[in-house]
Amino acid sequence: MLLDAAGKSISERQRIPTPETPTPAAVLEELDKLSKLLPGFDRVSVGFPGIVKRGVTILAVNLHPAWANFPLQETLAKRWDKPVRVGNDADIAGYGAIQATGVELVMTLGTGIGAALFTNGHLVAGLELGHHPWLLGKSYEDYLGRRGLDKFGKKQWNMLLKEAIAQLEFVFNFDHLYLGGGNTKKINFDLPANVSVVSNESGLLGGVVLWRDQG
């Protein structure tokens, strides 16, 4: 999606399926196709589903091992001859969702579990909640990611999510929790007053703020 300087969309959202074997080469080829559908951009923000440090993708458990230590930011900047910033996808979704007041936690429910923590609008970098041990030595992702949903079914998945929300409030003392990702559509219980579901477009709209918060 193309955004203006205020973070408002000025184009339709474009989507291309992730390659069946999502190696860096295969994904970059699809990103080239996307770039041609969105002409006229002067800079690029990229949300990546894994650990990112200084534009390098460190680990992507749910994508492909070849993304380990891949210089995605530098590669795209050279490929498209534009300034590029790459960040964790949950972090960028958070930029688009938060109100920049107090302690705000963002959790995305999809193939895996993404998470981002903000204090007064500033990102606390490096949070990887999805892989943190939770119950019986298994991680949040084992229970609340796609494999957990497939294993336990929708009813138990909702019970586990409700329990996780209560536990996370004890851990982070958040003022607000934002839930995003495709599996939020499967939530069937009433959320607490300080928890809300946000649109998947927040992951796109937050791309502008990625440039503001990091200079």
Per-range role (PLM):
Residues 49-52, 110-114, 183-184:
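Short glycine-rich anion-binding loops that position phosphate/pyrophosphate groups of nucleotides
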Residues 72-74, 78-90, 123-160:
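Glycine-rich phosphate-binding loop plus the immediately following alpha-helix
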Residues 168-200:
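Glycine-rich phosphate-binding loops at beta-strand->alpha-helix junctions
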Residues 157-170:
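A short, acidic, amphipathic alpha-helical segment used as a generic capping/interface helix at domain edges
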